[in-house]
A protein has these predicted regions:
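Predominantly soluble domains enriched in secretory-pathway, periplasmic, or organellar proteins
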Residues: 1-168
């Protein structure tokens, strides 16, 4: 019962961004960002929506090298209808010879990229080793959008069911 759409009939554009494109996130200013596994880079490209695009639509604007072999990337609310923020985090799979040895497994690493400037102005701001296994998927949300509790609403609160639980 699920309709199968013809690929060519629903294709708006196809932007050649580089080798090994994997994941795409969006910024608040009309740019999209795609991780390039084989290029070890993140591509910035302009989307084509008239009145929204910052530069020529559907075109590669720039690439920023990351180390090494990026998989997932995350921008603030970058996979929603209203992306928000000035930063991208590149979740890189390899960090060969970049950080102190932590044992037989090499750490992966995250890189914080400033995406606040227009055009080809991208800058890596920070590198962080990460030893929690290969990084997969992340969400970034502005802190002022969270309504965090300082304490649970009631004694015996189960955070999984969001209710009082006699076994909690």
């Amino acid at each position: 019962g699920v309709p199968i759409l013809d690929y060519e009939s629903v294709l708006e554009a196809q932007v050649e961004v580089g080798l090994g494109p994997l994941h795409t996130q969006f910024g608040p200013d009309g740019y999209a960002y795609t991780s390039l596994f084989l290029d070890s880079a993140v591509a910035r490209w302009s989307i084509g929506a008239e009145g929204y695009r910052p530069q020529d639509g559907w075109s590669l604007i720039s690439k920023i090298p990351v180390q090494y072999n990026v998989g997932h990337i995350a921008t603030a609310e970058g996979d929603t209808v209203s992306p928000d923020g000035n930063f991208l985090v590149s979740l890189n799979k390899w960090s060969v010879d970049r950080f102190m040895s932590t044992g037989p497994l090499l750490p992966q690493n995250f890189q914080l990229v400033d995406i606040s400037q227009q055009g080809d102005n991208l800058q890596v701001l920070y590198d962080m080793p990460f030893t929690g296994g290969e990084p997969h998927y992340a969400q970034i949300i502005r802190a002022d959008k969270l309504n965090a509790w300082d304490v649970y609403p009631e004694v015996g609160w189960n955070p999984l069911t969001q209710s009082v639980d006699p076994n909690a």
